[in-house]
C-alpha cells in the first residue's frame, strides 16, 4: 500500500523559516485534516488512512522537524500550514504527534475544529528517565537509528514490521529519529487547553507497550468529557495493526 500511496500522493517539500519539511497532501474536497506521526515515523506513516480519506478530506500529513521544544515546533507547524493556505483544520496526532497536537490547540485553539489523540499523552514524565536522556545525548544520530532498526529487524514478520522498516529504516533520517526521541525525554506537561472536550477523541490500545496504563488513565482524567475508544490488540500502531477499527472510530468522529 505504500507504493500505492506514493504513486497517488507523492511527498512534496515545503520550506518554512528556511527549514525544508516533507508533507504528503491529498487536496481532497473536504476540510483539511492535519496528521502528525509519532517520534518514529514520516508523513507516510498513516498510509492506510490517507488512502481511505484522501478524496473526502484535504489530508496534510507532516514529517515535522524537531524543534527547540514542543511550543516552538507547534508554532512552526502553524506557520507552515498558513503558508500553504490552511488556517482552520482538524488535527490527528499519534504518540508524540498527539502531544504536539495539544500544543497546537493550546497556542491557537480557534484554528482547530476537532482533535484526535491516538496512543498519546499529555504528561510525558512517566516515560522519561535520566538514563534514557543521557543515553540519547551521548549517542550519535547514526547509533540511535541503528538501535531502532535493529529492534525492528528482530520483531515478528508482519505488515507493521515491513512498513516500519520502510518508513523508519529507509525514510527517516538518523537526525530526525534522535531529535524526536530527545524531544520526548525533554518534554513538559501540556498546559491546560481551552477547547471543547466534546471535540476531542482519545484512542488507546489495551496492549500498548509504550503508553502504560497509568499514562492512559492520566490523559483520560485530563480530558474527562472527551470521547474515548479502546482498540483491542492494536499495540502502539493501531492505524496499521487494526486499520478498519481505527478508521471507523476516527471517521465517525470526524464525519468523514
Segment roles from a protein language model:
Residues 93, 97, 101:
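Gly/Ala-rich beta-loop-alpha elbow adjacent to hydrolase catalytic centers
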Residues 102, 106-107, 113-142:
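Flexible "cap/lid" loop of the alpha/beta hydrolase fold
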Residues 196, 202-204:
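Short beta-strand/loop motif that positions the catalytic acidic residue
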Residues 12-67:
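Conserved HGGG/HGGXW glycine-rich cap/lid loop of the alpha/beta-hydrolase fold
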Residues 234-247:
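Catalytic histidine-centered segment of alpha/beta-hydrolase-like enzymes
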Residues 207-211:
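Acidic catalytic loop of the alpha/beta-hydrolase fold
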Residues 45-51, 58-92, 248:
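Active-site loop/oxyanion-hole signature of alpha/beta-hydrolase fold enzymes
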Residues 126-128, 142-195:
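Conserved alpha/beta-hydrolase catalytic His-Asp/Glu region
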Amino acid at each position: 500500500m505504500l507504493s500505492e500511496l506514493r504513486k497517488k500522493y507523492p511527498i512534496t517539500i515545503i520550506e518554512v523559516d528556511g527549514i525544508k519539511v516533507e508533507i504528503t497532501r491529498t487536496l481532497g474536497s473536504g476540510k483539511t485534516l492535519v496528521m502528525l506521526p509519532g517520534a518514529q515515523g514520516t508523513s507516510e506513516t498513516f498510509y492506510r488512512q490517507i488512502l481511505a480519506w484522501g478524496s473526502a478530506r484535504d489530508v496534510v500529513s507532516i514529517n515535522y522537524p524537531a524543534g527547540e521544544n514542543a511550543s516552538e515546533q507547534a508554532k512552526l507547524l502553524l506557520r507552515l500550514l498558513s503558508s500553504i493556505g490552511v488556517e482552520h483544520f482538524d488535527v490527528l496526532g499519534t504518540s508524540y504527534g498527539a502531544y504536539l497536537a495539544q500544543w497546537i490547540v493550546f497556542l491557537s485553539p480557534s484554528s482547530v475544529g476537532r482533535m484526535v489523540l491516538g496512543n498519546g499523552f499529555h504528561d510525558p514524565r512517566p516515560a522519561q528517565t535520566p538514563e534514557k536522556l543521557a543515553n540519547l545525548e551521548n549517542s550519535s544520530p547514526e547509533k540511535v537509528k541503528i538501535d531502532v532498526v535493529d529492534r525492528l529487524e528482530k520483531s515478528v514478520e508482519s505488515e507493521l514490521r515491513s512498513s516500519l522498516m520502510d518508513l523508519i529504516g529507509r525514510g527517516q533520517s538518523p537526525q530526525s529519529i534522535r531529535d524526536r526521541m530527545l524531544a520526548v525525554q525533554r518534554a513538559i506537561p501540556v498546559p491546560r487547553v481551552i477547547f471543547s472536550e466534546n471535540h476531542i477523541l482519545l484512542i488507546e490500545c489495551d496492549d500498548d507497550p509504550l503508553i502504560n496504563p497509568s499514562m492512559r488513565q492520566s490523559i483520560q482524567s485530563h480530558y474527562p468529557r472527551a470521547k474515548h475508544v479502546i482498540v483491542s490488540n492494536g499495540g502502539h500502531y493501531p492505524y496499521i495493526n487494526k486499520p478498519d477499527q481505527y478508521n471507523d472510530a476516527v471517521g465517525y468522529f470526524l464525519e468523514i
